[in-house]
Amino acid sequence: MIDLYLSKNSQRNQLLLDFFQNYGIKVSCHSVSEMTKDKLIEMMSYSSDCFEFLSPNLLRFKNRDNLRLTDFIEMILKNPELTIRLPLAVSNKRVYPNLNLEEARALLPRDTKQLIYMEQTHYLSS
């Protein structure tokens, strides 16, 4: 199951949802405004550098020693549409920020990827 936090770009969201549906992958869609403090902390724990799924504008806070984590999280959750790189997928304790169709392929099961590869190579050799 993939948790997908949607962006404001409805066309991009629909492309991703269609992609997952075509491959029979279950997706649980969420609005980023539904994100809780606990969920954000959980996602941060999945990443070696939580700034990879946050807006580049927040990089200025990366080396600040005087900013408490709780204050930083509150700042992110005040306006998550601008501070989190959307659409964002969470699957198997991994975070995939700013997801597009090419990157979505990484979320396909291995056997599905192998079938796609075999179909493409067979098609090319015919």
Model-predicted segments: where are they?
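Thiol/selenol-based redox catalytic cores and closely related redox-interacting motifs
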Residues: 34-126
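Local sequence-structure signature of Cys/Sec-based thiol-disulfide redox active-site neighborhoods
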Residues: 1-33
